[in-house]
A protein has these predicted regions:
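Short, well-ordered beta-strand elements
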Residues: 329, 336-345
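Short, surface-exposed loop or secondary-structure junction motifs
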Residues: 96-316
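Short, conserved catalytic-motif segment at the N-terminal edge
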Residues: 2-57, 78-80, 144, 234, ...
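Short loop/turn microsegments at loop-to-beta-strand junctions
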Residues: 19-21, 32, 180, 325-328
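Hydrophobic (often cysteine-bearing) scaffold residues that line and stabilize catalytic clefts
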Residues: 5, 57, 61, 66, ...
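Short, P/G- and charge-enriched loop/turn segments at secondary-structure junctions
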Residues: 10-12, 54, 287, 314-319, ...
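Short active-site loop at a secondary-structure junction
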Residues: 11-24, 44-104, 153-164, 244-247
C-alpha cells in the first residue's frame, strides 16, 4: 500500500507528534494497511513499537465496551433508551436530574460536567488508609460524587462531552447485569468474538498471560511516581480500580478493528448486534430533545465538519471516537473504509496536542490513496 501513508506516520514520529503508533486501514472489507512505527516507550528504555502492542484505549472504552454493553442489554429487553436514570439511582429523582435518561447519557446531552478530579480525594485517603486506592470503596465513593454532581445544563439543552455520564452508564450495566462491567463485556463481547487481547486491567490483577507483553507507555505520572505502562492512564479510572465506563479498556489495533467491524456488519444486518440499534447508535441524533449543532450519536461521534478529526472527506454516514492517550477510530459506512490509529502521544507527557492537526491530515491522505478522492 501507499508509501505516502508510511511516510506520513514516520513524519509524525520524527516531529514528536507521538513516540510511536500502529495504523490499520481497511477498505471494502479487506485490511489494506497494518504497520507499526516509532517506539512503544522512550523512558526508562527505548522499545520499538510492534503491530501487536497493547494500547490503553482511553475513551474508546465508551463505544467499544460501555455503549456496546448498553445496546446488548437493550436488545435483550433488559433496558430501554427512554429509561430514566432515577430508575437505577435515587439521587436522580429530584429536580432536573429526574429528566435524565440513558439516551441523554449516551448522547452527551445530560447536562453533566465533562470531568472532575475525583481521584485526588482517593489519593489523599490512600495516604491515611493504604490499600484504599482502587478498592470497591474507592469506586463507590467516586460514583457517589458523580451522582451528587450538580448539573451545568438542563438535560437535552446542551451538548457537553462527559466522562461522568459514562461512569454512570458503567454503573447501570453492572446494576442490570448483576456482574462487573469487565466480566459482562468479556462474556458478551470479547470472548464471543475471539478478541482475546481486549480487556480491562484491575489494579494489582494483571492477567499472568499479559505480564510479558509489550504495552505502549503513557505518561510519566507525578502522583503515581512512575511511567505508566500496562495500567490505565486515566486518573479517575485508576482510582476506581481500573474498570470504569469511561476508560480502562486495553487492546491491539487488530482487535479494535475486529470490534469495529462487528458494528459495521451489524449495521448491514450480518452482525451480532441488532441492526436498527447499531444504526441508531452510529448516526448523528436530530430532534427536539437534541442540542443544536451536536455531532453525537449514542456512544459514537460523527464528523463535525468543517473541523472534524476525521478530515475533509469522511461522509455524513461516518462514525468514530477519540481517546485521550492518542487513539482514534473513524469509519465511513458509505465507502466501507475503517481507519484505526493507536498512538502513545501522552508519553512521556500529556503536554503535546500536535495530534489534533496530524489526525485530519492523515485521514485526508488515506482517502486520497485508498478511495481516490
Amino acid at each position: 500500500m501507499s508509501s505516502r501513508i508510511s511516510q506520513k506516520m514516520q513524519e509524525g514520529v520524527a516531529a514528536g507528534v507521538f513516540p510511536g503508533g500502529v495504523l490499520l486501514v481497511s477498505s471494502q472489507g479487506e485490511v489494506r494497511f497494518h504497520q507499526a512505527f516509532g517506539s512503544a516507550s522512550l523512558i526508562p528504555n527505548q522499545v520499538p513499537m510492534t503491530c501487536d502492542t497493547l494500547f490503553d484505549l482511553a475513551s474508546l472504552t465508551k463505544p467499544l465496551a460501555t455503549a456496546a454493553a448498553i445496546l446488548i442489554l437493550i436488545q435483550n429487553d433488559l433496558l430501554a433508551l427512554t429509561d430514566p436514570l432515577s430508575k437505577f439511582f435515587p439521587e436522580f429523582t429530584f429536580g432536573a436530574k429526574r429528566e435524565i435518561t440513558l439516551y441523554h447519557l449516551l448522547n452527551h446531552s445530560a447536562g453533566l460536567p465533562d470531568w472532575k478530579p475525583y481521584y485526588q480525594e482517593i489519593a489523599e485517603q490512600e495516604e491515611k488508609d493504604p490499600g484504599f486506592l482502587g478498592s470497591s470503596a474507592a469506586k463507590q465513593k467516586i460514583c457517589q460524587r458523580v451522582k451528587e454532581e450538580p448539573l451545568i445544563a438542563y438535560p437535552g439543552a446542551k451538548s457537553l462531552y462527559s466522562d461522568l455520564g459514562f461512569i454512570l452508564l458503567g454503573e447501570v450495566v453492572e446494576a442490570v447485569a448483576t456482574e462487573p462491567l469487565h466480566r459482562f463485556c468479556y462474556r458478551n463481547l470479547f470472548s464471543k468474538h475471539d478478541c482475546k487481547e481486549t480487556f480491562f486491567i484491575r489494579l494489582g490483577r494483571r492477567p499472568q498471560a499479559y505480564r510479558g507483553r509489550l504495552f505502549a507507555a503513557t505518561e510519566e505520572c507525578p502522583w503515581r511516581g512512575k511511567v505508566i505502562r500496562g495500567w490505565v492512564h486515566d486518573d479517575n479510572a485508576y482510582a476506581m480500580g481500573g474498570v470504569a465506563g469511561h476508560a480502562g479498556l486495553f487492546s491491539t489495533a487488530w482487535e479494535v478493528y475486529r470490534l469495529v467491524r462487528l458494528w459495521f456488519d451489524s449495521i448491514a444486518g450480518t452482525g451480532p448486534l441488532n441492526s436498527t440499534l447499531a444504526t441508531l447508535f452510529t448516526t448523528c441524533q436530530k430532534g427536539n430533545d437534541i442540542p443544536v449543532g451536536s455531532s453525537w450519536g449514542l456512544g459514537w461521534d460523527t464528523p463535525s465538519h468543517p473541523h472534524s478529526s476525521s478530515g475533509r472527506f469522511f461522509s455524513p454516514m461516518s462514525f468514530g471516537h477519540l481517546g485521550f492517550t492518542g487513539t482514534s477510530i473513524w469509519v465511513d459506512r458509505k465507502r466501507d473504509l475503517i481507519v484505526i490509529l493507536l498512538t502513545n502521544r501522552v508519553h512521556p507527557s500529556r503536554d503535546n496536542s500536535e495530534i489534533r492537526l496530524f489526525r485530519p491530515e492523515l485521514h485526508d491522505l488515506i482517502f486520497e490513496e485508498v478511495v481516490g478522492v
